[in-house]
């Protein structure tokens, strides 16, 4: 396990929106290594992380280094897995980075998959814990922290210190699927989609009701586009598999959007069209 009171050599494993946002935030506190799976994804991730770092007070693009080699993580004391919300790929990555960075604490950004399964199947139980940020990472203040029973208690203060150092507010949450935010949020989002299915209302009409009537900063359909429709489906499927409750089941319209490649903002189309 990592020693000391704080992380000095963090790494982020992933090249998507959450990974690059975390890398940008981490650059406020120290150098950070970003692990991508291919040269093409590494180039895109570096460009995105550098761009985001420039938008953060104290962010420093020069502190962000990108690699495609897991062996480069050998000296890291924290590795944060931030890839697709699927058990198999996350387990494989945690196993790989845990072997490569033998002394590092291992965080996962999941909120819907079982931390206990991720820890046990990766072979690194005791080192794995949950750090769940929110999209867009550079703007959202919260990180949910979750330590399974098997996780070394010494990780807790290190994790809190790091999150605060990169400008986030930490709330420790129970080891339950969805933690707090997604457990409350996704039934609401899915109900908005079902309302469209049942009534024929448009996305703008539903969103306007919530932004103007409930003073929400963003409507549920626009928020689904921001989260990523595919990510929302994956989270819903994981929540439903655990609870069996209908309000966790992704609506058919969401699944149809994924099948059509309409994943929200990142693909240029979802419930709305984007330039």
Task: Give, region by region, the residue ranges found by the protein language model.
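NAD(P)+-binding Rossmann beta1-loop-alpha1 motif at the extreme N-terminus of oxidoreductases
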Residues: 1-55, 100
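NAD(P)-dependent Rossmann-like dehydrogenase/reductase catalytic/cofactor-binding core
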Residues: 2-6, 30, 37, 164-169, ...
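Structural motif
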Residues: 13, 67, 82, 108-110, ...
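Short glycine/serine/threonine-rich phosphate/pyrophosphate-binding segments
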Residues: 18-22, 88-90, 111-115
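Rossmann-like dinucleotide-binding cores of NAD(P)H-dependent redox enzymes
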Residues: 36-60, 147-154, 170, 177-185
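Rossmann-like NAD(P)-binding element
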Residues: 37-41, 54-105
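Rossmann-fold dinucleotide-binding core
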Residues: 105-174, 179-183
